Amino acid sequence: MKTTILILSIIVLFSSNSVLAKTINGKPRIIDGDTIHIKSNKIRLHGIDAPETKQTCKIDNEEWYCGKQSTKELKKLISNQKVKCITNDVDIYNRFVAICYVNEININQWMVENGWAIAYRYYSTDYIVEEKHARDNKLGIWKSDFMKPYAYRQQNKK
């Protein structure tokens, strides 16, 4: 019995690691500022949180669609090129969580560093330095007043 449990534990351990270490390549469809699809794979960009598509930000009391702009900036960065995503988790919506690259550029890092997403501290400590750079230089959404994307989602639950 102990041998069976040990063997099953080893199988589970190795099978879960192989899923988490998956590499996905291809031309993505951009869903929003932190989500892409490659073929049938839904991918959430690790460690970042971008404004939701319908989310607005304010500059001098003027609203602008920062969520749509975040998506546009991601599309511009990828510009119909192939990306490489290295998964490290699967989220509660059954999406792969991954760090993705276009050429040698870390897409996740670029989105935060240029102010089109924030570091998602709830799940990761990655990209905090990049967020500070964007905030200090008033890049992207940091040039405006905005609600953190996770707070926006909470407030606008359907």
For each predicted feature, which ranges?
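Small beta-barrel nucleic-acid-binding modules, primarily SNase/OB-fold domains
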Residues: 4-11, 15-158
